[in-house]
C-alpha cells in the first residue's frame, strides 16, 4: 500500500496557479502578477505576448523558489481592463 501524502497537494496538482493581468492604459502594456507564483511580475504589449512570456517565466520561477508542483502546470489566467465609455450626446 502506498504511503499517504502529508499535507495538501501542491498548487498545480489539484488546483491551478492564479495569475492576474491588468491593462495599464498609460503605459500601454498588460502587467501580470500572482500570489501563487513568488516573484512573478511580467509585462507585454498584448495578452498573447504576455501568455507566451508566462509559459517560460512561471516554470522558471517555481523552480527558483523551490515551489512544489507537478509536471503539468495549470494556470487560471484572469485578465482585467478598465474602459471609459462616453455616453452619446
Question: Residue ranges of each PLM-predicted region?
Answer:
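Short, charged, surface-exposed hinge/linker loops at domain edges
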Residues: 1-22, 48-89
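A general structural-boundary detector
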Residues: 8, 37-38
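Short aromatic-glycine-(Arg/Gly/Cys) micro-motifs in beta-strand/loop hairpins
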Residues: 22-37
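A short, exposed loop/beta-hairpin motif centered on an aromatic-Gly-Thr core
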Residues: 38-49
